[in-house]
Each structure stands twice: as C-alpha cells, then as structure tokens.
C-alpha cells in the first residue's frame, strides 16, 4: 500500500471532536513504516550507525538536529516521526485493557463465545443501546448491568455448557473455575473430565478433594481465539464500538514502535557511547525475548521453557506500557525503575498536566519585588535589563515609522531599541546585533514587523504564585526604570498577597494589540479594585499609608501655609502635574492662620475645582465611643460631605481593604474606577511624605511598662492565681459543680482557661490605659495598620495562656507537663500560662511552652497549604466550565442546566454594595441629598413621596428590573415616608400649611428631583450589577471558596456555648462538605423542642433520644449458680432511672434484651418485681454453659434499653439571646429520621449537619440547602464572608443530577463526560483506556479540553458568536383572505 505523506494545507481547520479507539494489528501495520526485527541498536562496524530494521532506524524519524529524517526528509523541528511495528511471536495481554478482558470473559460463554444473555434480554439491551445520544455514564452503567446479569448465569443459554467463575490469579494470569461445582453436573465436558479420574481415585483417595479445585488457565492465546469467535451482533452488548475496535484488539499480537523524536538518544560526553531512552531499551528486551521464543519453538524446546519466556515477554510488554505494576515476582522484577508510557502521561510532571494543560512560556520575566509609593496603582517599574530582553512585535505604519527607525538604529544594547526585524511576507528574522543597522532602518517599509524593546506605557501582565484567585494576575502599565527589581505601589499587595521579604513575581508581555486591549479592559488593576468573592475592596491603603492618614487627620494636627502647601504639592505628579490645587480657607485665622490635617486630607478626594467628585460617607471608625455620631470624643465617626472630611480620623475601616464603608469604595461605586484609583495614588504619595517629615518610629522605650502597670499586673496575677487554686481545691474535695455534658476535669479546665484569659485581657486593658496617645505601637493598633491590642499587652504586660489544640498544655509523661512541676499539677504555670511579658523575658519553662504553641502553628500552616491546594484544584476542575449564558441560565460545557438564573437573581457578587444585596438604599439617598440639595424645591409629604415613586417606577426604563428589587425599593421608600411623617407630626407641621419655612428645609426632606435621581441611580446600579453573559461563574465560585481556605485553621472548635461538644470546622469541615462524605467526624442534629422554655421537658426528651445502656442503669449484673440452674441477675437502679427522667422499667428492659442480637428468646427472660430481671441462657452442651454465661454477662451491659442506638449523647443547649432562656437539644450522632419522630421534638425545625443523612431523610433539595448553610456557617465562624451566590452554585452543581455528588475523582466522573478533562485531572491512563474500550467520542467543548487542544473556549469573549447580517428582502404583500370583508375589521386599540 503506497502511503501518502501528510501535507499541511492552507485551509484553517478546527478540531471538532476526538474519537478514541483501539488499533487492530492490520491498522498498526498500515500506520507503520518499517517492521522492527533487530535487537541490536547500532552496527558493529567503526561508523557506529543505527542499524537498519533496528529500534533506532532513522526511517522512524530523527532525534539529531543536523540529520534529516530518512522517510520524509524533514529536520528535527518539522518531522513528526514515523512508526514501526514488532510482530509478537505469542500474543500477550495488554496491561491497560486487562480488567476489560476479564470483564468480557465473565460475560461470554467460554465454549461457544456467545454472550450469556437470553434472546429477550439481548433484545431489551440492544433496544436501549439504539437510543441516540447515549452518554458515557449511561454506557458504563449499562455495562455493569449486563455484566451482573451474565455473572449470575452459570449455564450458557445457547450451548448449555457450564461456565464457572473467571478471576485474576497472580500477575496477568486469568483462571476459569470450570470444574468447581457442587450440583449434579449436566455439562458433558465436565462429566467426561471427572469420569477420567475415576480409576485414579480408586487407587488414591487423596485425589478426589483436589478435583474440585481444577482450573482452566486462560492464557492470551486461548483468550484471543475466544474473542475472535465472538459473533458480530454480540459486540455492541459488550458496550464496545465495533468501529473503534473489536474484542480481539484487546490482546497484543503486534506492538507499535514509537518515533525516535519521543525517545531520543543522547550522546554522552563523559564516556564514548550514548544514553538510550527507557522505551528504547524496553523495546530491545521485547525483541530479544521474541527471538528467544521463536528459536525455542523452531528447535522444539520444552513447553516449560517456552511458558517461562512467554510470561517474561508478557511482563516486559506490560512494563513497556506501565512500569508501576504491583505484584511482580522477585525473580522477574526489573533491576532498575524505568518510565513507561503511562508514567509519561500521568502526574504533575506528565504530558497532560505538565505540557498540555499548563506550560512554560516565552516573553516572560521574573525577579524580586520592591515597594514604590511614587508609582500609580496601575503601574509597575520594570528594570532596563528586563525591558531589553522582552520584546513586542510592532507593525511599521505611517504613524510610527520614524520611531521604529530610531529603535532599529539603537539596536539590542541601547534602550529603547529593537532586537529583530521581520520583513513583510517573509518568515526570516534579522538580528540587529550584527550588520548595518542604519541601512536596515532606512529600508524599513510599511508592514514590516519590528520586535522592539518593552517601553513605557506597554501593557504587561503581573503575577504572583500561588495564584489562588483571579486577582493574582492583573494587567499593569510598564514604566522602565533603573535597578534590578520589579516595583509597584504597596496598595496592590493585598490581591497578590505579596510582601517584600524576598518575594519574586512574574511579568508577561502580551504579543498582540488585541491581547493588550483585552488585558487592560478585563485584567487591568483599575477594573479589579474589588474581589469577586463578596464585592469588598481589595486594592486599598495599607500599613504606612494608614498610619500617615490617621496621624494627618487627628483633630490636633495643624499646619501653617508653607507646610500645608508642601504636603499637598506631593500629589502634583504625573497626570496631576498641571492641575490647579484649590487651597481651602484656613480653619484658624487668629493668632496665626492654620490649616487642619482634615483639610489637607480632603485634597486627596477633590484636589481642584475642576474635579467633579463629590463623595459622601457617614460611618463609624474603629474607636467610636457608641453615641453622639460626629460628636464622638475619640473623633472616630467619619463624616465626608461633598468630598470634604468634616469629622473623624482615618483608619483601616475607612481606607483599608475588606470594608464596604471605605472611601475608595464609595468613589468606585459613585464616580467610577478611574477616580477611585487616582485618589488611592494621591494618598500613596501624600501619606508617606507627611509621615517621613513628621517622623514615626518604634523602639524599646515604647514597650517599657511603668511602675503603676507592673503593680496592677501583679495584683491581677495574684487574684487570678488565688481563684484558680480555689477551683483546684474544689475539685480535690469533690465540691466542684460540673458543667452540662462535662466531667469534673473538663469543667476545671474550662473554668481555669476562662479565668486566665480574663487575667490577660485585664492586663491588656490596664496597659492601654497607661500608654500615651503618641505611643507608636498604640497608634498602629488604633488605626489598624499593624498589630492589635493583644500584641501590645503581650509585649508590655503578660503573654498569657499557651493553647495547644484549643486546650492547656497536656501532661507529657509521668502525669506532668515537665519534670520541673509536681505530678498531677493543675497550676497555671505548670499548664502553660506565661505570666511574663516579652519585655521582661520568659523563664525557661515558659519559653518551652511558648515554642510548643508556635510549633503547632507552623505544622498547621504547612499541612493546611497542601490540603487547600488540592481542594482548590478539585473545585476548579469541577466548576471551570460553568458559564452564564445569554438566556441567563448557568450551564456546563455540554449544555446541562445547573441554575435557571445565576444565584436566583442574576446579579454579580463583585457588584454588591450591601451584604449579598446590590444596593444600600440609605447611603444612596444620603448621597443624592448631599449632591443635589434642591433648596428651592418644596419637600414631598408622606403620601406624595409614595405616589410619586410609584408613578416613576411605572416608566418603561424600570421594566428590566426584577419585581423583587422593585419591592425592596418600595419597602425602603415606605420606611422613609413613615420617618418624614413622624418628624412632621413631632414639630406640628401638616401637609397643607407650614409653621416656619426654614424648618422645612432642614428636616428629612425629599424633593421630586431628589426622588427621581434616587430612583434613576438605583436602576442604573441594578443594571450595572447584572452578571455579564459569558462570565466564568464556575471558576470564580471555585476561587472564592478555595482562596479563603488558606486563611482558615485546621483545628476542631468547641460548639458555641457548650464546652464539651466539639465540632469540626475550618478546612477539614469544608473538605467533608465538598467531598459529600457519608460519615462525617462530628455529626450534630439540632432539635427544637415543643416546649422550649421548660428545662424538665428538655431532660425528658433528652432521655428519649440519648442512647442509654443497661449497664448505665443497673446496680449490678451478676452470675447466679444454683444446684439445678444458673442464670444472670440484673438489678436495676430505680433512683438513677428517676433522676435521668427515663421511661424505663423492668418490662421495657426485658423487651430490649429480647430484640438485641444476643439470641435470647422471650421465654428465657423473667421479671421479678420492679427492679430485678433474670436471664437464663438456653442449654446446649453443658460443658460450654459457663462460657455462654460469661459472654452474656459481657454483652448485657451494652444492650440499649432506651434511645436511638446511633446517638452517642445529647446535650441541652441554653440560648439566652432573646432575654429569656430557650432550650434546644444538640444530638451527637446520626439517624435524623428517628430524632424527628421522637415525641416532644419539633420535626419541622430539626436539622442535621450531615448532608448524606439529610438527603436520605428529606431529599435532594434539603441536602442542597444543608450544603449552603454548612459552608456559610463554617466561613462565618472564621470571619470570612462569601457571597451566597457562589455557595449556591457549588451546591447546585453537587446536587443537579438528583444525588449528592462529591467534588472528588468519583463525583467528577459522574458529572463530566469529557475524556480529556477526566484524564487531565486524575487516573489519566484508566480514563484513556476506558475511552478506547467504549469507543468514546470527545466533543472538545469544556475548558480543559480546549486548553489541551489549543482552541478558544466557549466562555467569556469566546461565548459570543458573530452572526452574518442577511440582506433584507422586502416582505411579500399580504394576500387577502377568502370571504374577507373590510367592513367587519375591528381596529386594534393601542
């Protein structure tokens, strides 16, 4: 057959789908170029050339740069390589299809090779298979059903032959238990076999029991012959695609030899010779074994020898494909580990994850980062050295030809210059380091491409790893500067999570104008000031900027004209250089003119009269005293009116990240991202200038305690230690009152821990009282720039209790924490309380305990990083292809609907101004009132306000708003109108007349213009908050849930209010939820009671639910031996039963013993009186009666007499939030249904934290709600807030198939169809072999597949399909209807 070479066509083609399948031996031969027969690699002569028909034959491609391929004549870069093949002397099992081979053998008759299904069953399954669009999952499920049906039959429906069990036996061996049968044998083959041994059995009886163990060995040759005989109509029932491969293709009879380019020979410099690839060496071994078997067969060697060689050949073929086989016999085990095909594909460094899904890139740089507050927040300083290496291909045109010529003249060594020129219509590049640059510059033509250096103003991508969320890579504008580090504004540290202690960052230069535009608009720093997790600002002032702004805005900061002008002048840089700064009138005129720091700060928001910004904000600061608003004595109520700071000092809440009451956030939402970024850049220049001129430092003097503080500390310690001694004494004398659900020891620990934490808190308070307002650590803690009050008190007063796993330091050995203390000591010092401060220094024992707590923190962090990294990878893989469509639904790449509208309202979490809400109406209204005072307009009365708002909302512009949003606005306006009415009533103003005109202008007035502007603003903001079609909502959801995980802890926490009840929180809890674990570590059912204010009723219900064992309510359980009888006597403790409020008596105990698994009949249990139960065991042999009694005595205390067996305990929880005590039960354990059905429990208000349990009891919707609530509860406990829309999307994905699917390799396989996607996640080889077996077709539509194939994905920009505008034809004239009469036409009323 003549083979035509592949020719690259000019027609651009897109891969529409990939079909997986198996190659038949004939296809392998057609695809290959040579048959490989020689085991030698090189010829033995002096040339040392690769041998023809050897494994390194150059007709299979080339692995050397200077040698062309002998088949196609191309060089190493262009030749894709060509295959060879080896004919195996004996067939071998393919290790990848070994499970599939066993599966088929279990489904077919080993005599007639037909599938073991009756004609009706066959028809039924074939009808099902004919359904169009049968999914991969359905195929796998069907194969399982067919296999189960076939395995249940042991007689073939067609030939009547007996079929035993087929199973794997040892390494790549299959046996058929053909003769193992207990029934009367009907099969003549088996009968003949057994009869042939009759004579032998007569002579040797020992042979008989061994006959049943006789097995048929199914070697590859036998299996191949069986598979070849399978009828063509049965192949679809094996769930194989006949076009993609037949069952006989599962057995190797011919082996493909891969091209040389994927297994290159490396010439060794150290010793003469070459280093060969693992695959090459494995192939030579296979050829050698092939030759050995061939010789043995020709020479007629012993079968034993041929079988051994065959086994070894089979092993080598298996290792060639997968070198990590387990169970290899020692005598056959390879000497050194090699890499097979599977190893090349799988794992992080494999082809899928290492080279296809992600790869190293050109046009990138990496170096150390440094801060530079003089740069704008959207800029990055790039070293000249980097700028000379990174190039951008710019097309020469009329506008830039002179500039390009200048760059060409400069060449590669002078910046700005150019490195290469590519002339129009040629592929050749000319390097500018050599040659006549002047001549090249003159010869430049339009359309030529100059690869110029990176210059100021270029768009670059800046990234820091680990990239946990989308803000870890953003677009900046380059500024080429001297020195060797990347520099950027510190405001942008938070999204990158960068610090300057040696961190390195990556820089990428986009290579097309389209990429630059897309990067700036979508990834620009200004476009990403807020986090998509919950819409909070992430790029904001930090550390020194906060300290500077705080000190600048204190109420006692004043400047003369020169100083004020000097500080304000620091903002006149870059695009603000030419603005005319408006200096406000001085706040103090006499005795000297002085400007306040607040006035200077206001110039950041509105530097000149030309600036249109009118920002308005009213919010509480960190130190707000709680009353008086702007009259707060700490000056911590911030009021900004039309961009003027009226009151309050700046702190982290008003300038920093993580708060929506932030000045920059207000600017962003009301005036746009450019104004917010400009204000931030101005602050970043002004605050450090002021701080460096004022001076701000920290030294040992700042943390030196005074005498008064030391005295107060010792008094506190003395009182606290005394109280702890009293608790310990109470425990020793047995007077300590136990807390609910706790032992005496646990109660003591809880009390002492509480007492010691009070000591530290009080010492901290005393410390803060003594510190001066100018104390540097105190200033940093007050403004939130660094540290907290606890850090200050630890430095000055007292370090406090060291906690290990949430409790005091445990006893290490010999019942004490260290040998320096007495045994069983409970003293604070012995259990890790550090009374010293860092200033005074720690004693050796304190230091040791302190290091224990520190070590725990380090280990926790290290473990957590790995856990969350893997969790985030799983989340991203499962959610990545979810995308909001143009019909507002959220669908996967295959078109499955996950949500009918994103988050229930179609709004973008990044655009939320309130908590999970698109708008904060009160703030919007206050802003409108300040910006549009409308003093000449009359105010609206209550009724006018409501009626006017309703008439405005009936306009067409409001039709696009959802009803729920319009209802929210109406509700807010109604509240405002009620407030106006109350104010008017208070001052006696009626709607008609006025008492005093001036009063009307001051009170809560709203004019028609203000109302209209308010409603317009609400509508605009709502429309802007809509989620854009094409948004990768899945990826955002995965990052928003995965990224906070890194800030969580791994430990379990005490359940709120109950010291003894632990609950898993943090990373392990999130992991449990998204894995959809069936058995969680701390299942807790929260049960509301019918009477929630009665403690006795709560105890009664607790007794009904909690598992009570017979041993717990018995005074004793004894054996009684009488001359004629023996039994076990159980004496119940009636007092204990009464105190525990149990509904138990002797009769119920008798019933419980009978229904337990002790095999005791009702007649064997006798009740005597109220409290005595006798259990008489059944007689069997008298000798074992004693043992029967002993086992009964051991098992009886474990009999459950009341309660739910799955419940380990229930705790009464007292809720005092509403002012009066409310009781509910916290039940540890499962069986939600039984708890809900318990008398006294409100079933409709009972919930569990176990998703699986909820799904089993209440169904899939309840399970979905549980997932949402549990993730939110866990996040809130760690101080994280995630927009509910993200959590809803995750829970919808986990439950949309009708069962709860975990985000694991098993859940993912049930959610996704794509082979490439599953292969790029985990179990790479298994998925590929399965796909080949089923003949699977991958339509390449998801994100992973598109990245692997290098084609644009249908998400974001790729979702939109540009349609051709058809020529508009005139509509044909309307034809009159039969019997039509114009007189009867009814006009359409509009």
From Swiss-Prot:
Pfam families per UniProt: RNA_pol_Rpb1_1 (PF04997), RNA_pol_Rpb1_2 (PF00623), RNA_pol_Rpb1_3 (PF04983), RNA_pol_Rpb1_4 (PF05000), RNA_pol_Rpb1_5 (PF04998)
Underlying gene: POLR3A
Annotated CDD domains: RNAP_III_Rpc1_C, RNAP_III_RPC1_N
Residues that hold Zn(2+) 2 according to the record: 109, 112, 156
Organism: Gallus gallus (Chicken)
Subcellular location, record wording: Nucleus
GO cellular component terms given for this protein: mitochondrion; nuclear lumen; RNA polymerase III complex
Protein name: DNA-directed RNA polymerase III subunit RPC1
Molecular functions per Gene Ontology: DNA binding; DNA-directed RNA polymerase activity; metal ion binding
């Amino acid at each position: 057959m003549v083979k035509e070479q592949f020719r690259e066509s000019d027609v651009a083609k897109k891969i529409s789908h990939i079909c997986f399948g198996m190659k038949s031996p004939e296809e392998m031969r057609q695809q290959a170029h040579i048959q490989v027969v020689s085991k030698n690699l090189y010829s033995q002569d002096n040339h040392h050339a690769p041998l023809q028909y050897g494994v390194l034959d150059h007709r299979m491609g080339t692995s050397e740069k200077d040698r062309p391929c002998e088949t196609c004549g191309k060089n190493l870069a262009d030749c894709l390589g060509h295959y060879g093949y080896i004919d195996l002397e004996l067939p071998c099992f393919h290790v990848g299809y070994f499970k599939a081979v066993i599966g088929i053998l279990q489904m077919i008759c080993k005599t007639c090779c037909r599938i073991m299904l009756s004609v009706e069953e066959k028809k039924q399954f074939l009808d099902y298979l004919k359904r169009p669009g049968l999914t991969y999952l359905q195929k796998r499920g069907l194969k399982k059903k067919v296999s189960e049906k076939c395995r249940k039959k042991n007689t073939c429906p067609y030939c009547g032959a007996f079929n035993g069990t087929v199973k794997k036996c040892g390494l790549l061996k299959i046996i058929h238990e053909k003769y193992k049968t207990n029934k009367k044998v009907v099969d003549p083959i088996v009968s003949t076999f057994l009869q042939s041994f009759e004579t032998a059995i007569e002579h040797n009886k020992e042979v008989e029991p061994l006959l049943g163990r006789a097995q048929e060995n199914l070697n590859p040759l036998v299996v191949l012959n069986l598979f070849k005989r399978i009828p063509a109509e049965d192949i679809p029932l094996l769930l194989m695609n006949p076009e993609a491969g037949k069952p006989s293709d599962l057995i190797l009879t011919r082996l493909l030899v891969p091209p040389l380019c994927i297994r290159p020979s490396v010439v060794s410099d150290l010793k003469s010779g070459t280093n060969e690839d693992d695959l090459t060496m494995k192939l030579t071994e296979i050829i050698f074994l092939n030759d050995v078997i061939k010789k043995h067969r020709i020479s007629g060697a012993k079968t034993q020898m041929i079988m051994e060689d065959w086994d070894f050949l089979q092993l080598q073929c298996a290792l060639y494909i997968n070198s990590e086989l387990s169970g290899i016999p020692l005598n056959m085990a390879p000497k050194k580990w090699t890499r097979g095909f599977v190893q090349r594909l799988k794992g992080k460094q494999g082809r899928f994850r290492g080279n296809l899904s992600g790869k190293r890139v050109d046009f990138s740089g990496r170096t150390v980062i440094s801060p530079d507050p003089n740069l704008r927040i959207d800029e990055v300083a790039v070293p000249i050295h980097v700028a000379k290496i990174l190039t951008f291909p710019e097309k020469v045109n009329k506008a830039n030809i002179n500039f390009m010529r200048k760059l060409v003249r400069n060449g590669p060594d002078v910046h700005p210059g150019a490195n290469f020129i590519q002339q129009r219509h040629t592929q050749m590049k000319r390097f500018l380091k050599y040659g006549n640059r002047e001549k090249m510059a003159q010869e430049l033509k339009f359309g030529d491409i100059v690869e110029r250096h990176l210059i100021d103003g270029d768009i670059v991508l800046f990234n820091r790893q680990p990239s946990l969320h989308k803000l870890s890579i953003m677009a900046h504008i380059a500024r080429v500067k001297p020195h060797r580090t990347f520099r950027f504004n510190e405001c942008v540290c938070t999204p990158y999570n960068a610090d300057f202690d040696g961190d390195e960052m990556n820089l990428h230069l986009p290579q097309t104008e389209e990429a630059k535009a897309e990067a700036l608009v979508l990834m620009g720093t200004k476009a990403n000031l807020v986090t998509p997790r919950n819409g909070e600002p992430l790029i904001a002032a930090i550390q020194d900027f906060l300290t500077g702004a705080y000190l600048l805005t204190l109420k006692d900061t004043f400047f003369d004209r020169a100083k004020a002008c000097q500080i304000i002048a620091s903002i006149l840089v870059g695009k603000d250089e030419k603005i005319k700064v408006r200096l406000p009138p001085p706040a103090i005129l006499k005795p000297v003119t002085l400007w306040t720091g607040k006035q200077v700060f206001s110039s950041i928001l509105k530097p000149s009269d030309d600036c249109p910004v009118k920002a308005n904000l009213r919010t509480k600061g960190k130190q707000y005293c709680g009353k008086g608003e702007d009259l707060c004595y700490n000056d911590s109520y911030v009021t900004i009116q039309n961009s003027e700071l009226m009151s309050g000092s700046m702190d982290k809440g008003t300038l920093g990240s993580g708060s929506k009451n932030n000045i920059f956030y207000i600017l962003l939402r009301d005036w746009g991202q450019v104004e917010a970024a400009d204000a931030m850049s101005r602050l970043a220049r002004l605050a450090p200038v002021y701080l460096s001129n004022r001076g701000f430092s920290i030294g040992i003097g700042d943390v030196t305690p005074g005498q008064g503080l030391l005295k107060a500390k010792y008094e506190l310690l003395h009182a606290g230690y005394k109280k702890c001694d009293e608790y310990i004494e109470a425990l020793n004398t047995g007077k300590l009152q136990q807390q609910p659900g706790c032992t005496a020891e646990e109660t003591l620990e809880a009390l002492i821990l509480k007492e010691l934490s009070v000591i530290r808190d009080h010492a901290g308070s005393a410390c803060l009282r003594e510190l001066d307002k100018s104390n540097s650590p105190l200033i940093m803690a007050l403004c939130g720039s660094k540290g907290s009050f606890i850090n200050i008190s630890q430095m000055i007063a007292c370090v406090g209790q060291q906690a290990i796993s949430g409790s005091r330091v445990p006893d290490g050995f010999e019942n004490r924490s260290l040998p320096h203390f007495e045994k069983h000591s409970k003293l604070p010092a012995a259990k890790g309380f550090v009374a010293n401060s860092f200033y005074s220094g720690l004693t050796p024992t304190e230091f040791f305990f302190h290091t224990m707590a520190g070590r725990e923190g380090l280990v926790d962090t290290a473990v957590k990083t790995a856990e969350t990294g893997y969790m985030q990878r799983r989340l991203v893989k499962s959610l990545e292809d979810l995308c909001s469509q143009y019909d507002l639904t959220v669908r996967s790449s295959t078109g499955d609907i996950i949500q009918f509208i994103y988050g229930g309202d179609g709004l973008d979490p990044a655009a939320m101004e309130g908590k999970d809400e698109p708008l904060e109406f009160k703030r919007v209204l206050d802003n409108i009132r300040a910006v549009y005072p409308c003093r000449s307009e009359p105010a609206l009365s209550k009724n006018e306000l409501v009626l006017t708002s309703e008439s405005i909302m009936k306009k067409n512009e409001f039709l696009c708003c959802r009803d729920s949003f319009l209802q929210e606005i109406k509700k807010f306006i109604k509240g405002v109108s009620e407030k106006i009415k109350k104010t008017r009533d208070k001052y006696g103003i009626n709607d008609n007349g006025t008492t005093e005109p001036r009063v009307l202008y001051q009170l809560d007035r709203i004019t028609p213009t203000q109302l209209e502007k308010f409603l317009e603003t609400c509508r605009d903001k709502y429309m802007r908050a809509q989620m854009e079609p094409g948004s990768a909502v899945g990826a955002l959801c995965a990052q928003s849930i995965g990224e906070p995980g890194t800030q969580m802890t791994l430990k379990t926490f005490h359940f709120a209010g109950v010291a003894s009840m632990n609950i898993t929180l943090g990373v392990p809890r999130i992991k449990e939820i998204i894995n959809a674990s069936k058995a969680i570590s701390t299942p807790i059912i929260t049960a509301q009671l019918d009477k929630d204010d009665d403690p006795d009723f709560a105890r009664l219900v607790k007794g009904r639910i909690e598992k009570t064992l017979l041993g717990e309510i018995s005074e004793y359980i004894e054996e009684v031996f009488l001359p004629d009888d023996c039994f076990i006597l159980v004496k119940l403790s009636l007092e204990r039963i009464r105190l525990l409020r149990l509904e138990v008596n002797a009769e119920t105990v008798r019933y419980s013993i009978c229904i337990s698994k002790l095999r005791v009949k009702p007649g064997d249990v006798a009740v005597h009186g109220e409290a005595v139960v006798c259990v008489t065991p059944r007689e069997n042999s008298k000798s074992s009666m004693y043992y029967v009694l002993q086992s009964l005595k051991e098992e009886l205390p474990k009999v459950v007499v009341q309660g739910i067996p799955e419940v380990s305990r229930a705790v009464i929880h007292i809720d005092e939030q509403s002012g009066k005590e409310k009781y509910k039960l916290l039940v540890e354990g499962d069986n939600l249904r039984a708890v809900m059905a318990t008398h006294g429990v409100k079933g409709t208000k009972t919930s569990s934290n176990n998703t699986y349990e909820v799904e089993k009891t209440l169904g899939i919707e309840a399970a979905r709600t549980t997932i949402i609530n549990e993730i939110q509860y866990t996040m809130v406990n760690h101080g994280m807030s995630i927009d509910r829309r993200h959590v809803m999307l995750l829970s919808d994905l986990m439950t949309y198939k009708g069962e709860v699917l975990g985000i694991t390799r098993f859940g993912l396989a049930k959610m996704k169809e794509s082979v490439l996607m599953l292969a790029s996640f985990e179990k790479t080889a298994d998925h590929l072999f399965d796909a080949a077996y089923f003949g699977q077709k991958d339509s390449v539509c998801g994100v992973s597949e598109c990245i692997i194939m290098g084609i644009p994905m249908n998400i974001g920009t790729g979702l939109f399909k540009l349609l051709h505008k058809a020529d508009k034809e005139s509509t044909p004239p309307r034809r009159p209807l039969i019997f039509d009469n114009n007189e009867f036409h009814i006009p359409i009323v509009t």
